[in-house]
Amino acid sequence: MILLPQEIIRNKRDGKTLSRQEIDFFIKGITDNSVTEGQIAAFAMAVYFQDMNMDERVLLVSAMRDSGQVINWQSLNLNGPVVDKHSTGGVGDVTSLILGPMVAACGGYVPMISGRGLGHTGGTLDKLDAISGYKTTPDSLDHFRKIVKEVGVAIIGQTGDLAPADKRFYATRDITATVESIPLITASILSKKLAAGIDALVMDVKAGSGAFMPTFEQSEALANSIVGVANGAGCKTSALITNMDQVLASSAGNAVEVREAVRFLKGEVVNPRLHEVTMALCAEMLLLSGLAADIKEAQAKLQKVLDNGKAAEVFAKMVGALGGPADFIENQDNYLQKSAIVRPVYAQHSGIVQSMDTRALGMAVVNLGGGRHSASDSIDYAVGLSGILSLGESADSEKPLAMIHAQSEKQFSEAQRAIQSAIICGTDSLQAQTQVYRHIRLPDIS
């Protein structure tokens, strides 16, 4: 059977179901450059409009995963499961820095391959880059495997060896208005995650004003797709749909979020929302990977490693193993950049925080220099927001909406206006919000 890229595009354009051979051929062509940019764009648009069924999505993810190296952990004789978490992104979402060490301290191995900031959402790699000396690109995949075995967790960026088809595919989607396709989002996320050779995966799919997906229904559709496809590709996976109607942590930025993560791990300052979401994700990871028999046991194990300092110790070891300071956990302020200006922003009218345009707050951080408008932009790790009020908290002349970390008066003034517009105060008392909306497991997928 002779396969041609244009015929595969035609079949999908016309709403036909693609075969394994067609999908494998097309993804191989993306990897070896025998498929052109125009053909990738046409294929992406055909999928965008005609969708893919669950079988096609599984085949697409598997082909993209296998386009490069798939990490093998069996030769290391690990004495625990290999498990990971992925978030669709939000503002103040510092869970990865806390969750990885917690799960590792409970006996799991967490090879986390993370990304950089995208639009208004922060990136885990950018946060880690704020730590002096930390290398998000290890010397080799063998070095990465060695750190995971010895420490229990390592957080790095994608290497060229893992799912190379995704890099080219995504670059084309980014400039052809096909990023939003759920089958293609599913394939992009899972190809990289499954190439890490994990046994289990927990997805954190955000919903709300700061989420990647604009509606709850779309967040739910993405969660269902990822759970169904990942399990179909042989990786035990479940998802939590979590609240992104306000900033998750008390801070948003890079150094400011790292500082909050360290203080959380040390038990110094614990934001209740961040604690609830992190504990829920960690517990799901322990349950899915067999490290706990039930939710009560999982929560007890997790709280224990926070209380006895073991999770903080694992974080310190990871930072040291990847080139950061050996005493970072004790002396983080010596190694994290500070901005020239740290000053409060107050509400224009006193009241109770009613709502938050979380996306606008994320963009305020980007405009301070803490994120990128284009991929080539450099980041100022010192800037951001801290002490951000929660929904239902009172703001007045004594209690600011947030602290702005800026490098100039102009930056401060622009951020001040953005924050005052994004956080709405009124007179109504608010009930505490649910942070975890739904758990989605394989039996839930119709």
UniProtKB/Swiss-Prot annotation:
GO terms for molecular function: 1,4-alpha-oligoglucan phosphorylase activity; thymidine phosphorylase activity. GO terms for biological process: pyrimidine nucleobase metabolic process; thymidine metabolic process. GO terms for cellular component: cytosol. InterPro entries: Glycosyl_Trfase_fam3, Glycosyl_Trfase_fam3_N_dom, Glycosyl_Trfase_fam3_N_dom_sf, Nuc_phospho_transferase, PYNP-like_C_sf, PYNP_C, Pyrmidine_PPas_bac/euk, Pyrmidine_PPase_CS. Signal peptide: none annotated. Keywords: Glycosyltransferase, Transferase. The keyword Ribonucleoprotein does not apply. It catalyses: thymidine + phosphate = 2-deoxy-alpha-D-ribose 1-phosphate + thymine. Its EC number is 2.4.2.4. Pathway: Pyrimidine metabolism; dTMP biosynthesis via salvage pathway; dTMP from thymine: step 1/2. Pfam families: Glycos_trans_3N, Glycos_transf_3, PYNP_C. The enzymes which catalyze the reversible phosphorolysis of pyrimidine nucleosides are involved in the degradation of these compounds and in their utilization as carbon and energy sources, or in the rescue of pyrimidine bases for nucleotide synthesis. Homodimer. This is Thymidine phosphorylase. The lineage of its organism: Bacteria, Pseudomonadati, Pseudomonadota, Gammaproteobacteria, Alteromonadales. The gene is deoA.
